[in-house]
Amino acid sequence: MSMTKIPLAGVMGAPIAHSKSPQLHRHWLETYGISGFYVPMEVKAADVEHVLRTLPKMGFVGLNVTLPHKEAVLKLADQITDRARLIGAANTLTFGKDGEIHADNTDGYGFLENLRSGATDWTPSQGPAVVLGAGGAARAVIVALLDAGVPEIILTNRTRARSDQLQSDFGNRVRVMDWTQISGVLHEAQLLVNTTSLGMVGKPEMEASLDGLQAHTTVTDLVYNPLKTRLLEVAEEKGCVTVDGLGMLLHQGVPGFERWFGRRPDVTDATRAAVLG
């Protein structure tokens, strides 16, 4: 008598205790009555390759990857999606039957799905997007926005050199502005995105001037702790449509869950409540 294997998946990072992914995937497993497990794993940098070679032999079908391993796993992958290659990092791994590693990055997908569900009147072709920050999250957002058809991205970061590097990587659809001058271009923006940690619990507040922000601009913040950052509060006061950052986390988990467990999950109010709870 053959026994059906129960699929195993998880999330790997260091530290890992803060991750919301276990609550998210366990909620979906329970909601859809799927036999499967999703486990958090704290893994040191020196052990990443060994873990990735071992997990498929233990019955794991895939893995989410969080900081600081998102770039390292890309170098160990056998197959890499175009978007993961452009971003230079992977957050979703799927293991083949012989242990081969397929690497993807669903951060940009999650960002766009969250934006589209929270700001239904926003369309990419409306006009420029102003992006605050130039780290890994900014790369994912830029790749997604350019691919969606945003005509221009105005990029600013407290360290100018990092913005210049992204402009060099992505070309003339990205324009770099000094952090201190951003208020002067906000009136152009159809979309404003904060990809920095400013405004997060335990981090400094957003100090960039928002004087030029107009009511026609959609504003979204990747920070989700707190759900309503100072940036979103100011934007609401100015009449802007705002979108918090929690939905990006939820939506980026959809493709991996579908690949590992065979069911495409929905992101609902119950999903948000399960992760926040």
From Swiss-Prot:
CDD domains: NAD_bind_Shikimate_DH. Its EC number is 1.1.1.25. NADP(+) binds at D82, G133, A134, G135, G136, A137, N157, R158, T159, R160, A161, R162, L222, G245. It is an enzyme of class 1 (oxidoreductase). GO terms for cellular component: cytosol. The keyword Protein biosynthesis does not apply. InterPro entries: Aminoacid_DH-like_N_sf, NAD(P)-bd_dom_sf, SDH_C, Shikimate_DH, Shikimate_DH-bd_N, Shikimate_DH_fam, Shikm_DH/Glu-tRNA_Rdtase. It comes from Roseobacter denitrificans (strain ATCC 33942 / OCh 114) (Erythrobacter sp. (strain OCh 114)). Homodimer. The keyword Oxidoreductase applies. The gene is aroE. Pfam families: SDH_C (PF18317), Shikimate_DH (PF01488), Shikimate_dh_N (PF08501). The active site is at K70 (proton acceptor). Keywords: Amino-acid biosynthesis, Aromatic amino acid biosynthesis, NADP, Oxidoreductase. This is Shikimate dehydrogenase (NADP(+)). Gene3D superfamilies: Leucine Dehydrogenase, chain A, domain 1, NAD(P)-binding Rossmann-like Domain. GO terms for molecular function: NADP binding; shikimate 3-dehydrogenase (NADP+) activity.
